[in-house]
């Protein structure tokens, strides 16, 4: 009996973690080029998740829904990659190269971790805007930050992805802190329920 294989086409696959020129020091892609590139690769949708802000969201949505170019009709998915702190009001951090280190943290752990949030409906968009605003007005210190208490208050309508190697979950896994990684997953699942997902990212290693 031959084994059946699951085939994933480009039409089934959507990139949910992308940075544009609105990600300071971390984005080279121009928003105006996103729809064309997505269309050329056979995608029907694409997400924008810039670091610490949603400044490019409207421009991104307009580019994906260009009325003058039906060929580039890509479904825009809007989110952001937030900086997550244990306490958004905490100070006493310092720069160490490209890392942000918190006083008293063992083995020089970074104080701010990454977390991807994506709006799945209008309420999610409202909460995305609220979290972005509060990260700058209440949580800004080196980076615009949010914390778990804000997430718990403004989680409705949002999808949460664990993010990159700089996330709470993946950084703990990378350093062998498996119980801490499991604990973090449990916390996010408590907040987002079925809308929390572990992110899979291509890293070029077989």
Segment roles from a protein language model:
Residues 1-206:
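Phosphodiester-processing cores and adjacent nucleic acid-binding clamps
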